Amino acid sequence: MYKIISDTSCDLSKEEVKELGIEYVPFKISIDGVEYEDDDNLNMEEYLDKMEKTENAIKTACPSPYDYLKIIEENSDKDLYILTISSKLSGSYNSAKIAEQEAREKFKDIKIHVIDTKAASAGHTRVVLKLLDLVKDKSFEEVVPAIESEVNNSTTMFVLESMKNLIKNGRIKKSASDKFNKEVLYRFKDKTKTKEFYEIQEQIF
């Protein structure tokens, strides 16, 4: 028996994760002082509308170690795989690792592995789907190196249709975005660091 746990950087719908037996651990998003939890109760239409209209920075909070630990404890008798958004983009991976450490102290024989997908969104989803394929006929000891190899040999590319939210959150300067009024393609590679991301961005602009 196994259990796959993922933060909500994964793009699988709530219906799909239920069908596949995956457990989501949600991010929290704050817009104009109102906090939204990325779970089954999130009104996506309302959320996207407010995100588009606000002129203020949008704040996010990653899952806490306790959020992960609750699900781990409920499934401690299973092979556990936890997948997170890139550790370079969020503290979700660190939270999961803290929960893993606490679980190992509480459950001596637990089989648990935290996977830094080194990606987000579609790249994260691809790793989840690959993991689902691996667990069908491989043992925990075989799955772990196989999925890590998959992650380390992957590259994610993505397109930004708008830089509006990057500007609002202080990621890029408005003056820079005005000079480059096109869709921007980014390449997100293994071991990419935030500093390097900005250096590439500055070269583009």
Which residues fall in each region the model found?
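N-terminal glycine-rich anion-binding loop in soluble enzyme alpha/beta folds
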Residues: K3-D67
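Secondary-structure boundary/capping motif
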Residues: D39, T60, G91-S92, G123
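Short glycine-rich or small-residue beta-strand-to-loop segments that form or flank ligand, phosphate
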Residues: D79-S86, H113-D116, K130
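Residues that form generic nucleotide/phosphate-binding pockets
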Residues: K50, I71, A146, E150
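A general structural motif
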Residues: M1, D77-D79, D109
